[in-house]
Each structure stands twice: as C-alpha cells, then as structure tokens.
C-alpha cells in the first residue's frame, strides 16, 4: 500500500499552479491509495462552491465548512480527474 503525506503550503507558495501540475504528475505516476495533506488553503476572495458538485467529496459530520472555488484540495482533485484518477476525499476547515 502506498501512502502519501504532504504539507502543501498550497496558495502560499510561489508558482502554486505550476507546482500543482508537477504534484499531480507525481500522484499519477505513484498512484498512492491514501493521501493526507496539511495546510490545504483557499482564499477568502473567491466565491463559495456547492460541495455536492465537487468530484469525490465526502463531508465529515460536525466539521462542515464553506469551500471556495480556489480550494487547493478541490483543484487538485480536478487535475487528477483530468488524468483519469478518482479519489474520495474530505476537507476539514481549521
């Protein structure tokens, strides 16, 4: 079993979009079964999205939060779907 953990620093990094492309390529190559990320960010300026429309998203009871359009996890999942990879995932705002 392959497990991947990463502190993404997501939107705080320079060239965040380019780094996401590289990261999604690594995930495509390695295809881990389980992934855990820290510092999965989103800006406060983006509009909220309907979580029911986000691919593979599974809410956690008692930890509901408003997901925004530039949420790093949601964006990464979109990139992975383009590569034919599907993951169930959740996001807990802290």
Stretches found by the model and what they are:
Residues 1-92:
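N-terminal, active-site-proximal structural segment of metallo-dependent hydrolase catalytic domains
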């Amino acid at each position: 079993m392959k497990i991947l953990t990463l502190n993404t620093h997501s939107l705080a990094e320079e060239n965040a979009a380019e780094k996401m492309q590289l990261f999604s390529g690594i995930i495509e190559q390695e295809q881990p079964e389980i992934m855990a990320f820290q510092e999965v960010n989103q800006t406060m300026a983006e509009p909220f999205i309907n979580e029911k429309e986000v691919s593979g998203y599974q809410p956690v009871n008692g930890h509901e939060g408003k997901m925004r359009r530039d949420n790093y996890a949601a964006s990464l999942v979109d990139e992975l779907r383009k590569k034919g990879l599907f993951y169930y995932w959740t996001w807990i705002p802290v």
